[in-house]
Amino acid sequence: MSDRSLLVVVLAAGEGTRMASRLPKVLHKVAGRTMLHHVLAATRAAGATRTAVVVGPGREDVAAEVRKIVPDAEVFEQTERLGTAHAVLAARAALENGADDVLVLYADTPLVRPETLGLLRAPLKAGAAVAALGFEPADPTGYGRLVTAGDELVAIREEKDASAAEKAIRFCNAGLMALAGAHALSILERIGNANAKGEYYLTDAVEIARADGLSAVAARADADEVAGVNSRVQLAEAEAILQRRLRLAAMAGGATLVAPETVFLSADTVLGRDVIVEPHVVFGPGVSVGDDVVIHSFCHLEGARLESGVTIGPYARLRPGTQLDSGVRIGNFVETKAAHIESGAKVNHLSYVGDAHVGADANLGAGTITCNYDGFGKYRTEIGAGAFIGVNSALVAPVTVGKGAFVGTGAVITSDVPEDALAIARSRQVVKEGWAKAFRAARSKPKG
């Protein structure tokens, strides 16, 4: 529907008291992204031309998240919580600027797909003034009911105001609504609060539109997709649903997840073809994995880019700023951070590589540590192509080990090592023949 302008109004003013958290509800994360981020990303993918977000009083943290995701979004404050229609009207200035379609949704509904938003919006192009999204939950208790007559939506009745016959309806209100821009403001302004809670319900838009002789319809979505998150339990349930989606998409794209239920992905994780992910691997935000990569068990990746043919793990941790070029091997109990490791290099055991550049085909022996922090600042380590770092070596940054250089085992390197040189930085071994025998004899003499 690129020929029609779309104003999206996202309601993000809820207190979220059931979350029992100091963090605003909509800033809690699902698959590495805030719920608000998920919703805004879906609306962008659905063709939003303008975005308005309604936040609670003083919620600059929520406003900052909005602007980070959609820099040109308009942010409005709902000073009093008097119902959903009242919240939408907090964005009056955006509504007055006009749009062909207006889409209202909630920032605590992170699982809705762009395709479903398109389905909800479609009736407006066909002439409807209002379209509501419905679903059939396993238990409808607590939900508003969609009262229909044929293809028409007659009313949305909140459960507290529903008759016995209406409570028997299983088709429930998901909360998302689309309104024709030409009628949106007029309808919203006439919504009253004559109901059990004394609030201004957005759902009353249906009956007002029909009273004007306009059409209202209902679209249908899966229950999992429109699940709202109001508690930690529901947050975990949303995580499980989204993780399953992400795992299925990864496998459909050509990645092998040996035990999918033990692999946790972020919403932006990219896995190439013929990637093999063994059990118990966590992908934090910002991870891109090329083709033919093998990730062994118990690895944690975040903010890392892996080119084709890389092997990592088991028990590897890749932190933000890690770049592994093709064919790199990262072994067990290795941690990297802000490190670029070029093609064919190996860091196979028990090492920390931070704020570093490692050249192609270099080999870092077991226990190699880049000492990058002096308590005040971070410093870089440069390791040239083909360099060989002996086991249990400490490279005290800032320092450079040249191409093809060797560093002897157990070294503490504090000065640059030239290309093709050998650096030895440890005390010479001293052997005292018979010393141990004499020591034991002295210790075993009776005390007198």
UniProtKB/Swiss-Prot annotation:
Q: What class of enzyme is it?
A: transferase
**Chain positions covered by the region annotation Linker:** 233-253
Keyword vocabulary terms for this entry: Acyltransferase, Cell shape, Cell wall biogenesis/degradation, Cytoplasm, Magnesium, Metal-binding, Multifunctional enzyme, Nucleotidyltransferase, Peptidoglycan synthesis, Repeat, Transferase
Q: Which residues bind UDP-N-acetyl-alpha-D-glucosamine?
A: 11-14, 25, 78, 83-84, 144, 158, 173, 230, 319, 337, 352, 363
In this protein, the active site sits at: H349
Name the Enzyme Commission number(s) assigned to this protein: 2.7.7.23, 2.3.1.157
Give positions of region: Pyrophosphorylase: 1-232
The positions annotated for binding acetyl-CoA are A366, N372, Y373, T409, R426
Indicate where this protein resides in the cell.
Answer: Cytoplasm
Pathway note: Nucleotide-sugar biosynthesis; UDP-N-acetyl-alpha-D-glucosamine biosynthesis; N-acetyl-alpha-D-glucosamine 1-phosphate from alpha-D-glucosamine 6-phosphate (route II): step 2/2; Nucleotide-sugar biosynthesis; UDP-N-acetyl-alpha-D-glucosamine biosynthesis; UDP-N-acetyl-alpha-D-glucosamine from N-acetyl-alpha-D-glucosamine 1-phosphate: step 1/1; Bacterial outer membrane biogenesis; LPS lipid A biosynthesis
Q: Which GO terms describe its cellular component?
A: cytoplasm; membrane
| Domain of life assignment | Bacteria
UniProt key word Endoplasmic reticulum? no
Q: Which InterPro entries match?
A: Bifunctional_GlmU, GlmU-like, GlmU_C_LbH, Hexapep, Hexapep_transf_CS, MobA-like_NTP_Trfase, Nucleotide-diphossugar_trans, Trimer_LpxA-like_sf
Q: Name one GO molecular function term.
A: glucosamine-1-phosphate N-acetyltransferase activity
- The segment annotated N-acetyltransferase runs over 254-448
Sites binding Mg(2+) sit at D108, N230
Cofactor(s) of this protein = Mg(2+)
Q: Explain the purpose of this protein.
A: Catalyzes the last two sequential reactions in the de novo biosynthetic pathway for UDP-N-acetylglucosamine (UDP-GlcNAc). The C-terminal domain catalyzes the transfer of acetyl group from acetyl coenzyme A to glucosamine-1-phosphate (GlcN-1-P) to produce N-acetylglucosamine-1-phosphate (GlcNAc-1-P), which is converted into UDP-GlcNAc by the transfer of uridine 5-monophosphate (from uridine 5-triphosphate), a reaction catalyzed by the N-terminal domain.
Family, as annotated: In the N-terminal section; belongs to the N-acetylglucosamine-1-phosphate uridyltransferase family. In the C-terminal section; belongs to the transferase hexapeptide repeat family.
Question: Subunit info?
Answer: Homotrimer.
| Full protein name | Bifunctional protein GlmU
Please tell me the species this chain comes from: Xanthobacter autotrophicus (strain ATCC BAA-1158 / Py2)
